[in-house]
Amino acid sequence: MTASLHIILDTDPGIDDAAAIAAALFAPQLDLQLITTVAGNVSVEKTTRNALQLLHFWNSDIPLAQGAATPLLRPLRDAAYVHGESGMEGYDFVDHQRQPLAKPAFIAIRDVLMNAPEPMTLVAIGPLTNIALLLMHYPECACNIRRLVLMGGSAGRGNFTPNAEFNIAVDPEAAALVFRSGLEIVMCGLDVTNQAMLSPDFLNKLPALNRTGKMLHSLFNHYRSGSMRTGVRMHDLCAIAWLVRPELFTLQSCFVAVETQGQYTAGTTVVDIEGRLGQPANAQVALALDVDGFRQWVAEVFACAP
C-alpha cells in the first residue's frame, strides 16, 4: 500500500507517545516527514532524548526538531508521576550520537509546510505550545495545514484537574490560540481516549510480536495510566488511529473554547455540544470509540513494526 497522508507529529514522549510514534512510523497509510518535541510529560530535553532514542531503536532517519521548553506564559507542570522521571521508564535503549536539527520546532514545521507540494496534516499529541508559536510567528502557514488532529481536551471531566485534560491544562493560552485560529481541527479528547484501553490479554501478547512489542511491553509495565492487570489507556494513539481509521470514531461539530482565567477551571475545554453559546463550530470533537475495532487496528499496526 502506498502511503497517501503526509504528516508532521508534535509529541512529548511519554510512554503512550512511544506507541503513537510507532504507529505513525509504521502504519502503511502514513508518511511521517517530521517529528517535533515539546515540554509536557517531562522536560523538552527529556522528550527530545526519548524521541531520538526511539528513532535510533527503529533505525529511522526521520528528522527531529526540539521545541518549546516552557508553556507560553506559565511554568511547566509535567506528568513524570505517570511516565517516570525520564519519561520512558522501563527499557534500556542503546546509546547513540544522533542530534536534533539545528533549528527550533516551529521553524522546522514551517520549513516542511512551505516546501510541501500540498497542504499537510499536523498531529499534536502533547501541549500545543509549538503549534501556537508557529501560528504566532508565521500565520501564513495556516494555508499549508490541511488539518490539525490533536489529542487533548475533554467534553466532561479532566485527568489533570477536575475539569481539565493534561495537554490543554499545561499550556491553556497556546490551546486557546489554536482553537481560535480557524484551522480545521479534530479533537480526540478524554471522551474517547479513556475508552482506548489495551487489555491485559493484548498486552501479554506483545513480547512475542516483534522487538517493538517487547520494547512497548517493557514501557507499559511502568506506565501509570492503568496497569498491566487492568489494561492501559492509549491516549495519544487515538490521534493516529483517527488518521487511518476515522470510521472507528463518532465525531460532532462543536464550538470549543479554552478557559485561561479560572482559578479552578484554567485549561478546561468548554465543548458546546448542544450549541447553547450560539457560536459557529470550530472543531470536530470525538465523543465515542469502537473499542474492539481500535484494538484490532493497534494489533495490525504494531505487527507492521520490526
UniProtKB/Swiss-Prot annotation:
The gene is rihC. The keyword Hydrolase applies. It comes from Salmonella heidelberg (strain SL476). Hydrolyzes both purine and pyrimidine ribonucleosides with a broad-substrate specificity. The keyword Isomerase does not apply. Belongs to the IUNH family. RihC subfamily. This is Non-specific ribonucleoside hydrolase RihC. GO terms for molecular function: purine nucleosidase activity. SUPFAM superfamilies: Nucleoside hydrolase. Keywords: Glycosidase, Hydrolase. GO terms for cellular component: cytosol. Its EC number is 3.2.-.-.
